[in-house]
């Protein structure tokens, strides 16, 4: 009986950790998307030939607005797509977790 409880506890903790990691990553990517939005808005008001710098693999690379803007917009779209997929995964995992709890008659007891 004790071993069975340990297995259930381990599985419960695993689900909770996965859900927490997904939520954290979604929030982090949301902040990245917001930063991209601010930079894109700022660059749209700038002259197309104006110099700007962007980080590529830890190095600052000089560019201009007209070159950097499409790259930033593409990255923002990719981030939005990733967030959407991660939200779907989060919802699916939460449903699996609830089903697992129901199937195994798991009740959370807090001290």
UniProtKB/Swiss-Prot annotation:
Its main location: cytoplasm. It comes from the Eukaryota. Keywords: Chaperone, Coiled coil, Cytoplasm. Residues 1-36, 72-92 form a coiled coil. It is found in: Cytoplasm. GO terms for cellular component: cytoplasm; prefoldin complex. GO terms for molecular function: protein folding chaperone; tubulin binding; unfolded protein binding. GO terms for biological process: protein folding; tubulin complex assembly. InterPro entries: PFD2 (IPR027235), PFD_beta-like (IPR002777), Prefoldin (IPR009053). Heterohexamer of two PFD-alpha type and four PFD-beta type subunits. Present with 1660 molecules/cell in log phase SD medium. Binds specifically to cytosolic chaperonin (c-CPN) and transfers target proteins to it. Binds to nascent polypeptide chain and promotes folding in an environment in which there are many competing pathways for nonnative proteins. Belongs to the prefoldin subunit beta family. This is Prefoldin subunit 2. The gene is GIM4.
